[in-house]
Amino acid sequence: MNEQSQAKSPDTLRAMVAGTLANFQHPTLKHNLTTLKALHHVAWMDDTLHVELVMPFVWNSAFEVLKEQCSADLLRITGAKAIDWKLSYNIATLKRVKNQPGINGVKNIIAVSSGKGGVGKSSTAVNLALALAAEGAKVGVLDADIYGPSIPTMLGAEDQRPTSPDGTHMAPIMSHGLATNSIGYLVTDDNAMVWRGPMASKALMQMLQETLWPDLDYLVLDMPPGTGDIQLTLAQNIPVTGAVVVTTPQDIALIDAKKGIVMFEKVEVPVLGIVENMSMHICSNCGHHEPIFGTGGAQKLAEKYHTQLLGQMPLHISLREDLDRGTPTVVSRPESEFTAIYRELADRVAAQLYWQGEVIPGEIAFRAV
């Protein structure tokens, strides 16, 4: 231990680290890390500064930014030769719509919705779920798009069928680390679902409540597109924590996205923000970026309804090819720029869920990542 470090008490070291962290700013932080009480542990050993943070939402991508921006300052002011960073989670269980009772084992339900089909809602839901898992969370997906259940195909699990360990409940299908269920596991491609709204809604509620979900931090709910009876019924009856609305920059998609936001507001489901999908087409040959569906629409929509633009997702052939193969980009290309974008989206969604919500005491589980 050098003289500089000997002169520092544990309280002094902690104050130095806390002061540096207090200056760190990031889109996922409504308040700074010190105010959030994220600094869990500071220690000194063999000229190495050990810093552990505990966050109430997934934050791994932002954590990498923190290390990059703050390490040099901490080395300079503490005299340490190295820093050992550690991130752990206390994933918070947040208040559900209308204080409904939760689903056994599930902390938070995130509804992914769109006002119309064809905007990439399901692909966004799948990659968001995988990105949340990649950030360190326990995640599940329920495919509520009963008339077009595409999640099994996107996850390469279309040939699997759920089992019932007790004759009453279904065990979820595990795929790429996600616990999943879908009406697509129960019917063949040749059998179209012709149920009316009430029957479809009842079936989906049964799937949600009678699936033996493992302990999940986040359950991503891939909603049916549109704002009709079935969507309204699901939004009213499922204990959702928050909703994400997916759109494209195209004017007609934005019109329908408005309807989705208004629907959630009417049933008192917090809208976490908007995801602008296909915001930029990227040529696979030359890399040229072109906004073929227009620009700026989702940002204006977010401002009008006082919500967040959570992310702008590109349109690239590899994203489609990966889904067609049943190996979404987040798992098949973990180091790609597209995966980085989805992981940043996951951080923003989880953070917005936390900042907009109300923590339910006694429903927080500690877990290191």
UniProtKB/Swiss-Prot annotation:
Keywords in UniProt for this one?
Answer: ATP-binding, Hydrolase, Iron, Iron-sulfur, Metal-binding, Nucleotide-binding
Provide the residue positions that the database annotates as binding ATP. Answer: 115-122
Q: What is the effect of changing residue 283 to A?
A: Can hydrolyze ATP and transfer an Fe-S cluster
Any one GO CC term of this protein is: cytosol
Describe the inactivation phenotype: Mutants are impaired in Fe-S cluster metabolism. They are conditional thiamine auxotrophs and have lower aconitase and succinate dehydrogenase activities.
Q: Which SUPFAM superfamilies match?
A: Fe-S cluster assembly (FSCA) domain-like, P-loop containing nucleoside triphosphate hydrolases
Q: Which InterPro entries match?
A: FSCA_dom_sf (IPR034904), Mrp-like_CS (IPR000808), Mrp/NBP35_ATP-bd (IPR019591), NUBPL-like (IPR044304), P-loop_NTPase (IPR027417), YlxH/NBP35 (IPR033756)
Cite the GO molecular-function annotations of the record.
Answer: 4 iron, 4 sulfur cluster binding; ATP binding; ATP hydrolysis activity; ATP-dependent FeS chaperone activity; metal ion binding
Where does the source fall among the domains of life?
A: Bacteria
- For this chain, the annotated S-S bridges are none
- Alphabetically, which GO biological process terms does the record hold? iron-sulfur cluster assembly
Q: Is ATP-binding included in the keywords of this UniProt record?
A: yes
Effect of changing residue 121 to A: reported as: Hydrolyzes ATP and can bind an Fe-S cluster, but cluster transfer is compromised
Pfam families named among the record's database cross-references: ParA
Q: HAMAP family annotated for this entry?
A: Mrp_NBP35
Q: How does it assemble?
A: Homodimer. Holo-ApbC forms a mixture of homodimers and homotetramers.
Described purpose of this protein according to its UniProt entry: Binds and transfers iron-sulfur (Fe-S) clusters to target apoproteins. Can hydrolyze ATP. Both activities are required for function in vivo, but the ability to hydrolyze ATP is not necessary for Fe-S cluster transfer.
| Similarity comment text for this entry | Belongs to the Mrp/NBP35 ATP-binding proteins family.
Q: How is this protein named in the record?
A: Iron-sulfur cluster carrier protein
Protein source organism: Salmonella typhimurium (strain LT2 / SGSC1412 / ATCC 700720)
Gene that this polypeptide is encoded by: apbC
